[in-house]
Amino acid sequence: MIDKLAEGSEEVDLYFIGYASRPYDLALEFAQRVGKPCAITQACCASAITSAEFLARGLEFYSFEDWEDATEYMTVLRARKVMKDSKILAATRMTSTVSVSAPDSIIDPEKITERFGTRIRYVSAHELLDQISYDDPMENYCTPGRKGLNLTAEDEKIIDKETDELIAGAEECEMTREMVKKSVEANYGIQKFLDAYESNCFTAPCPDLCATRRLNQKQFTMCLNHSLNNEQGIPSAC
């Protein structure tokens, strides 16, 4: 019976336990077998008994007052699942441990992976900026002889289209098309890096990059990039 109940458990994130009688031992055996979080809604003494039974053995268990309470808390569990399946592409200038731009951030990135399962891939900010260009991908300053992810003529067609759509859809735009395009190029280039590094989140030390004057040279900031990423469901921030 336990084997039958456990079928497809690899596709399940959370099991809700319901008792027709009081087979507490079966519920415990099932939870130990599948290794997945379990929960129960208000079920008289069963809620307290099952909670004690599971938690005493280090099993993840939730006891909810009602379905409304359960539904609300499951948003937290969904967020945890997303974080576990996420990989951050972090552009760094000097150190990946402490951000000069955000000293209030976490000081040990390994703790993110340890606690949430989120992985981090690092890329040199200078390599990234080199490749947000239409230059020869084999001639980038930081990686000479190694083919980069530089923008292509085909990419530019898409970038031009996105630039025009962005301007046309704006309630107000005080930037020239040329300047808007530079920020769209940055976003497009960063998304190429996200694909190449199989990442779904992005961060860069924006103020620290401003201090290098590379962004001044490139004539864009990360602001629009972060906004466009966020609109597409890609967490992105300084």
What are the residue ranges of the model-derived segments?
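An N-terminal assembly and electron-transfer interface module characteristic of large anaerobic redox
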Residues: 1-238
